[in-house]
Curated annotation (Swiss-Prot):
It comes from Litoria rubella. Expressed by the skin dorsal glands. Keywords: Amidation, Amphibian defense peptide, Secreted. It comes from the Eukaryota. Shows neither neuropeptide activity nor antibiotic activity. This is Rubellidin-4.2/4.3. Signal peptide: none annotated.
Length: 9
């Protein structure tokens, strides 16, 4: 999670 949540991945 983290940047992946922002990117929607």
């Amino acid at each position: 999670a983290g940047l992946l949540d922002i990117l929607g991945l």
